Amino acid sequence: MLWDALLYAILGGMSFGTYPLFIRTPAVIQAKPHTIVFQLYKSSVVFLSGFLFLIPRYINWSNDTNNKDVPLFVFNWWAILSAAFWIPAGLFTIFSVPIIGMGLQVSLAASSSSILTFLAFWLIFGTEMKSYSCGTDCKYYLAPLYLFCTVLGMVTLIFSEKLTARIRKHVCDNNIDRKNNTKRNTEYKRYLTPIIEDEETETGSSADESSPMVAIPPVAKRQLFENNPETSTNGFGRWTAGVFLSLVGGIFASGQFAAVQQGKKIEQINANCLPKNVTCPATLIESFDTFGSWYVSFGIGAMAVTVLLLVGLSCSLGRCPNFHWNVLKSAGTKAGIFWVLGNFFVTLAVVRGGNAVIMAQVLSTMIITSGCWGLIYYKEGDQSSLRKFLWIIAAVFTLLSMIMLGFQKIDK
């Protein structure tokens, strides 16, 4: 178990789980900026921050005469590919968060990305997992079990509100049944007893009125149905699109970080320096340096792809879109900063611990962080103590599962 990789994964997941917070602020929702416009602010922060990383490196590089043979910057095409995966993932997130909510969007994207990443890198790319003996020519793996537990915890976090509602409904139904049985027993005793108890009759008839399961008037039912995006005719298609794009966004996020690990592995094989970097050429080492050339190349790719999309949007509209500077100069910049922090730590974690296990840990932390913001900051969904209790239990279960999953990867 690489504890430094786990720490990077948790820090990255917390940052990634926080950046959607600024997508659904009241000002942003009211302004309704185009997803590409919001992405432009994020890409600009990523582009500029990459060059900020080079400033302290340039100072050390210029003062150290022994490092003149080591280049300050080496362009990396794998970073461009990673950025090409990142842009769609970001666009799908920006589109779906205001529709289905921050907690559900992150949970859906994390679940799809976690399953795809683990299966692809274990079964296709050959990431080794610990096996356990069960006899002669018999072995089994615990990694799929812990992956299943991680996904189960994710699903529980997603549907914690609905589960709470079902539990509360079951308890209320039982209370109503007990009150109805008490009422029937009282009426049966009155039938056998010649004494008329008017007071008891009045008490029995009002039992249902004090029940927490009070009947909703038909008009109110219709209004609730029409205002719910999951059930209304107008909102169901948009809600479904938000759910679908959240799942697809998780798949693109997996490709973003897959380009880091697989690209580095391919280049090391071509340079005959796998698995240790000490014998690799200086240009190869620098091109995949998270603090330097890799991030600068990623920022260049992100900005280039975003500008191309913006040009296409302008051509389709016949004019430049509204950039909403007064609103997005704060929200877009903050979202970009938290994404930069998340990408920085997650890239470190992937390079240190591999993609198969690290991404499951990152995505689990993202779900817990976004869920906390949804419960505490935005007050999303049911705020009852029962729902919070179920959510905490599911969060702890998910954390333990992802830690145990980390122990299953063979460290090399």
Question: Residues of each region from the PLM?
Answer:
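Polytopic alpha-helical membrane proteins, predominantly small-molecule transporters/carriers
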Residues: 1-412
